[in-house]
Amino acid sequence: SSDYTSGRINTAGKFSTTYGRFDIRAKLPKGRGSWPAIWMLGENIGTVGWPLCGEIDIMEHVGYDDNGIHASIHTKTFNHGLNTQKTGYTTLSTATDSFHVYSLEWTPNYLRFFIDQNPYFFVYNDSNGDVEKWPFDNPHYIILNLAVGGDWGGAQGIDPTKFPMKMLVDYVKVYKKTELQTDVNVTFSVDMKNVNTNGTGIYISGGNIS
């Protein structure tokens, strides 16, 4: 039997989506051995398996690196099993002392990751339609978890004096971009008598926009 129990909640079967802005305000746990994560998995994992389904790690933290914050993507081509995953890293001195907003901006063309509105990791879609490189045109669901130990979180052991460990989540917000009218018809009529020419250019004044 295991000495520790990890906790997870997810939206599988309840909420999945493609593209948008995802904001999660959270305070991370202290202690060597903790491994909190805010991430997403492709809802087709049951049929195509991992990593072809795609994985987006909005935030990962390991307790032995107090200030380190990671963001990653995993696909069939780019994943930790092959040691080819695409990963961003930054430091946040108050990650375990204060709440911060961890964000993902997901479009058909890129994934961009933020902490408190500050971007620190960007992945551009240069797959040319290859789903093994970019499975992120399919719906994903959200996962919030606090693991204890494991290959990464437990790489330097577990500090039993830090229990109980808690990852506190204030909110999870998802925003979808609305469709905007991009075609605007403009007619600009000019009285050509109001034309002035000098050494720097031609200036036309007066007119009506309709």
Regions found by a protein language model. Give the residues of each.
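A short, amphipathic beta-strand motif
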Residues: 24, 184-191
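Polar low-complexity intrinsically disordered regions
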Residues: 178-182, 204-207
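Short coil/turn motif common to extracellular beta-sandwich-like domains
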Residues: 181-187, 197-199
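GH16 jelly-roll
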Residues: 1-180
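Short amphipathic, basic-aromatic surface patches that mediate peripheral association
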Residues: 44, 188-195
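Aromatic-rich carbohydrate-binding modules that target alpha-glucans
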Residues: 195-210
